[in-house]
Amino acid sequence: MLQYGAPVITATRETGMDSQVVLALSDTGAGVPLRELALVGLTAAIITYFATGWVRVLAIRFGAVAYPRERDVHVQPTPRMGGLAMYIGVASAVLLASQLPALTRGFVYSTGMPAVVVAGGLIMAIGLIDDRWGLDALTKFAGQITAASVLVTMGVAWSVLYIPIGGVGTIVLDQVSSILLTLALTVSIINAMNFVDGLDGLAAGLGLITALAICVFSVGLLRDHGGDVLFYPPAVISVVLAGACLGFLPHNFHRAKIFMGDSGSMLIGLMLGAASTTAAGPISQNAYGARDVFALLSPFLLVVAVMLVPALDTLLAIVRRTRAGRSPLSPDKMHLHHRLLQIGHSHRRAVLLIYLWVGIIAFGAASTIFFDPGQTAMVMGVAIVVAIVVTLIPLLRRGPDGAQEP
């Protein structure tokens, strides 16, 4: 069997009436390359940080500037195209990873990391065009499908799907189902990140948090499977993305000197989709025990984490606008981040609150690879209660007449 461009040994273990499929790559036992992963992530951060200043000048020269609109939060013209700087950092870090002895074998057995560079370059270029000249929704959607198709063509695709209810178990996907599932998830995450990019530092911070969570999860898989190269792609992709987001964030946090634009938000979404797919897509969950099955479902929860805020925001917006007799696509200033500002949170605090909510879900999902799921759920429950209280503090401080208490 060929999986992610890697030779996979398939073994069938008969136990009575049960049959388990065990997938193993032909190169294991190298351990967890933590130092190399840290170096690659740091490289992405440093290069992105310094490239952003150059891209800002370039954006102003080419007229890629976001002028304030009625529904926008920013009040002064701000250059876009930050995704170009992030892509420079990503491509440079992946190139470095391909030259490091401890990580090179991941490129031999997998096409996941080169696929991200190629597809990421395509989605970033589409975003650059939109940042400068603007694209209609259909053209942009076609570009997203094309970029996601490049990932699939180069071997980044779900091959099995685990359904933990109704006794369904593991479903081996045929080629059509694999392609459709991968395209649907990837394009959904791309649009989720594009949609959530409404406050300074929000998309970059959410990309950083979710990428770090996927990296932690991937390191846990590497640890538990003796450094199996199957888990190199999600570890490298996620740490590179985390580094790029970290390097861009100082330029983008309130008040932003530059916006990442669609070139950046769509790049983040595509890389998160690729990292999640390579973390769980090729794994046969029947080969593991109950605890590992829960852990291997965590990439789904990581996808939920990055999509939770925009999905909830979108649903509420559709209901709100439909009840008001307006088009669901009509713009307004009632999005989640607008509401956080309206109840009394500052711009920075609103962003940090959304970081908190996404971080609870993302790291809660990732931690199942290290801790008991029941204990993880308890900690997450406490964290959610704390997050609710912190979110509602401005309302709790108000008196009965709605005035702020001293």
From Swiss-Prot:
GO cellular component, one term: plasma membrane
Top EC class for this record: transferase
Membrane topology value: Multi-pass membrane protein
Claim: Glycosyltransferase is one of the keywords in the record: yes
BP term (GO), one: capsule polysaccharide biosynthetic process
The protein's annotated pathway: Cell wall biogenesis; cell wall polysaccharide biosynthesis
Gene disruption phenotype: Cells lacking this gene show drastic morphological alterations before lysis and are unable to grow.
GO MF entries: glycosyltransferase activity; phosphotransferase activity, for other substituted phosphate groups
UniProt EC number: 2.7.8.35
Cofactor(s) needed for function: Mg(2+); Mn(2+)
CDD domains: GT_WecA_like (cd06853)
Location in or out of the cell: Cell membrane
Entries under PANTHER family matching the protein: PHOSPHO-N-ACETYLMURAMOYL-PENTAPEPTIDE-TRANSFERASE (PTHR22926), UNDECAPRENYL-PHOSPHATE ALPHA-N-ACETYLGLUCOSAMINYL 1-PHOSPHATE TRANSFERASE (PTHR22926:SF3)
Family indicated by similarity: Belongs to the glycosyltransferase 4 family. WecA subfamily.
Further remark: Mycobacteria use decaprenyl phosphate (C50-P) as a lipid carrier in all known cell wall biosynthetic pathways, rather than the usual undecaprenyl phosphate (C55-P) usually used in Gram-negative bacteria.
Record-given protein name: Decaprenyl-phosphate N-acetylglucosaminephosphotransferase
Species the sequence originates in: Mycolicibacterium smegmatis (strain ATCC 700084 / mc(2)155) (Mycobacterium smegmatis)
Gene transcribed to yield this protein: wecA
